[in-house]
């Protein structure tokens, strides 16, 4: 399936800025990838001394393969980039559009455990306006990858700047990292906040403060 024009534009913008997730080309179909992942996951689980003949575990390698390709890492494939509705700002609306508490679940690329949090996204309309649900879908697309939160925040910013044809975009993310919570230091209360500010959100203290306020 050919990539949409929006997907091509966003991918190009990220590559030009060095913000694309590190990836190498893969010529395999999604079904072929699932078969290979299932095979290797079966070997990994066997090395962990799990009995894959047990009825609770027998389908686990297949479930994990499907989850990786079709769900939690589906954002690695730009064929899954959301269909974007951008409309001309004919009404001349020029006040901040802000979407709070966008739920996001991603995966830490260092340990492949969960990142769980919320995003706040805002923009000042110029030439274009985007359908509100598309903002949520863009956040989700980039979250469905192995990620670091700093890159994820920047990817959402650049994607919206590209599609809206304006620098005036801001993104803030607050998340719990299970690589901190469930292993290592095992800190169950800390959260991580990242921001990516563009245009007037970066240059104007009042606009920045309005965005960062509840």
Swiss-Prot record:
InterPro entries: GTP-CH-I_C/QueF, GTP-CH-I_N, GTP_CycHdrlase_I, GTP_CycHdrlase_I_CS, GTP_CycHdrlase_I_dom. GO terms for molecular function: GTP binding; GTP cyclohydrolase I activity; zinc ion binding. Pathway: Cofactor biosynthesis; 7,8-dihydroneopterin triphosphate biosynthesis; 7,8-dihydroneopterin triphosphate from GTP: step 1/1. The keyword GTP-binding applies. The keyword Cell division does not apply. Zn(2+) binds at residues 108, 111, 179. One of its GO terms (biological process) is tetrahydrofolate biosynthetic process. Its EC number is 3.5.4.16. Keywords: GTP-binding, Hydrolase, Metal-binding, Nucleotide-binding, One-carbon metabolism, Zinc. Pfam families: GTP_cyclohydroI. It catalyses: GTP + H2O = 7,8-dihydroneopterin 3'-triphosphate + formate + H(+). One of its GO terms (cellular component) is cytoplasm. Belongs to the GTP cyclohydrolase I family. Toroid-shaped homodecamer, composed of two pentamers of five dimers. This is GTP cyclohydrolase 1. It comes from Shewanella loihica (strain ATCC BAA-1088 / PV-4). The lineage of its organism: Bacteria, Pseudomonadati, Pseudomonadota, Gammaproteobacteria, Alteromonadales.
